[in-house]
Design a protein with these regions (language model features):
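N-terminal "cap/leader" segments of large eukaryotic alpha-helical scaffolds
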Residues: 1-43
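Structural detector for internal amphipathic alpha-helices that build alpha-solenoid repeat scaffolds
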Residues: 18-28, 41, 49-63, 73, ...
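Amphipathic alpha-helical scaffolding segments comprising HEAT/armadillo-like alpha-solenoid repeats
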Residues: 30-41, 62-76, 95-111, 135-146, ...
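Residue-level recognition of short, well-ordered coil/turn positions
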Residues: 44-48, 79-80, 137, 150
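Short inter-helical turns and helix N-cap capping residues of alpha-solenoid HEAT/ARM repeat scaffolds
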Residues: 78-79, 110, 118, 149-151
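Short glycine/proline-enriched turn or capping motifs at secondary-structure junctions
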Residues: 146-158
Length: 167
């Protein structure tokens, strides 16, 4: 493990704050948002899962901007274990351009979650579809899943439709 990775891990574990990590990685004068984007570059080059987690923790505070939605491609890679963090962070963003991401995320199962009977990623992706219910495709996908034979996914879709009908 190199110094970058050690410092990233220590930050992810809460041992050092993000501000200190930024200084140690020579990003002291960079905004937290831009630093999160840099963390994703570091994550990809080093295949460092902790850096992905940290980046999306930062995006959770600063809201991933539409021009950066391409960064979500990292979600579909299997070398990290930050899939739940990514979809959770993004599920709170209202933007019709995210609907296809949520649809794909529902059916994506990373190898380390192959035995996940709770379908944690899919559930969070359904929250994202619910957040974007005003988008025609989101409503279409929720209705399609609500009428599907996939019991768990059907349940998640119905849950979102019922929740949203009470608003």
């Amino acid at each position: 493990m190199n110094d970058f990775e050690t410092n990233i891990e220590r930050c992810y574990l809460g041992i050092i704050p993000i501000k200190i990590l930024k200084g140690r990685l020579n990003f002291k004068d960079t905004s937290d948002y831009l630093f999160a984007k840099e963390l994703l570059k570091i994550a990809e080059s080093l295949k460092n899962s902790d850096a992905v987690h940290l980046a999306f923790l930062i995006f959770d505070d600063y809201v991933l901007q539409e021009e950066d939605f391409g960064l979500l491609d990292i979600f579909f890679l299997d070398w990290h274990d930050a899939h739940e963090d990514i979809v959770f962070t993004v599920s709170k963003i209202r933007n019709c351009n995210l609907v296809e991401f949520f649809k794909k995320a529902i059916n994506f199962i990373p190898s380390y979650m192959a035995e996940d009977d709770l379908h944690a990623i899919a559930r969070k992706a359904f929250f994202g579809l619910g957040t974007n219910i005003n988008c025609s495709k989101s409503l279409e996908y929720l209705n399609n899943y609500a009428n599907s034979s996939a019991i768990v996914l059907k349940k998640f879709a119905i849950e979102q439709l019922e929740f949203l009908s009470r608003k």
